[in-house]
Amino acid sequence: MMLLTIIAPPSMEEELIDWLLTQPNITGFTSQTANGHGSGHEMNIAEQVSGRRRQITFMIVLQKLMAESIIVDLKHCFSGSRLHYWLSPLTEHGSI
């Protein structure tokens, strides 16, 4: 299993939620507000002063091939949108 993490600007939150909900290989996901920090981000003046940029994080657990397929589709549907992602191995998951 893999954990696909997507970082999006707040302006894309609703559009990305709608898109993720229409994907047949995604049975659920988690989203949360996060703050990005660092010099590698384009920040406006207020963000530069506060040292953070608001963003939305999406986390999706998928089989590797499904995750790779979702990434291809994201690149096609959201080209140039400044989404950032990473794919990490997930050693264990479940419910308690």
Functional labels for PLM-detected ranges:
Residues 1-96:
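Positively charged, small/polar-rich N-terminal and surface patches that mediate targeting and assembly
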